[in-house]
Amino acid sequence: MNAKTEKQIENLKNQTIGVEIEMNHITRERAAKLATDFFGTGRYEFTASRNGYSTWSAWDAQGREWKFQKDVSIAGCDAEKCELVTPILHYSDIETLQELVRKLRKAGAISHAGVGAGVHIHIGANGHTPQSLRNLANIMASHERLIADALKIDQCRMNRYCRTVNPRFIEQLNQKKPTTMAQFADIWYTANGANYGRNQHYNDSRYHMLNYHATFTKSTIEFRLFQFDKPTAEKKNGLHAGQLKSYIQLCLALSEMAKELKTASSKPQQTENPKFAMRTWLIRLGLVGEEFATARTFLTKNLDGDAAFRFGR
């Protein structure tokens, strides 16, 4: 591994993380109790008066609040519509999050597109500029189809909750080349037909794989496209800690690459060998070595083609 890649990996790990996992088949109170038992703090309580969304909260040993909230988009009875919202996390916290996910799975929690459940990942926007955000939008526009195929994203979710980058937004963004965040925000909201209630949580511009509404309201970049695999005979409830870590690593790498590039193109990638295209792209993103082996597996296993040879053996 060369020094440039080592620095790239170091930088991607220094970003902050937030994760939202939608699930059902577990009540919010039970999930909070399970979390506080896992954290060993014994502190959990009903916090809806402060947080809304019928929230139950659990606190870890660092005093951070982990929320379990009601999300009406999740299928099932209201009592078991449960969305885990993490506090601000760091790379070193991923293993803790993974272990909590394993405990939720063992307790019966279910998360996959079939029950209207997705995974949203927030990366702190610190260090980003209008140019780096433009780079990220172009990177996503050129790779969204590849990512969607790799993750087998549910089409209903893509039609409603995690749409691809709006072509009007990309066109205006690359024509106007904003130099301030205010200019960037104007393009984002007007191009997406959502130039109203910019401070409202449910502004319609948010329902994209790459959500910059979160950037202007929460100082994060939200990736809304993820979901756990549907259940199989071997894996019944969809939650998977390794898959979640892979998603987080991909988002961190995308954010870091956008910061490092001078410019990025929105031109779609080659499609004759998707598996090869994904593997080589992950290498450019810095997801190399044993640490990212699971991510490379999850992000290439569903794609057609030969990972080693673009035009076949």
Positions of PLM-derived features:
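C-terminal accessory/tail domains of diverse enzymes
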Residues: 1-113, 126-313
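Short, conserved phosphate-binding/catalytic loop or strand-edge motifs used
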Residues: 115-123
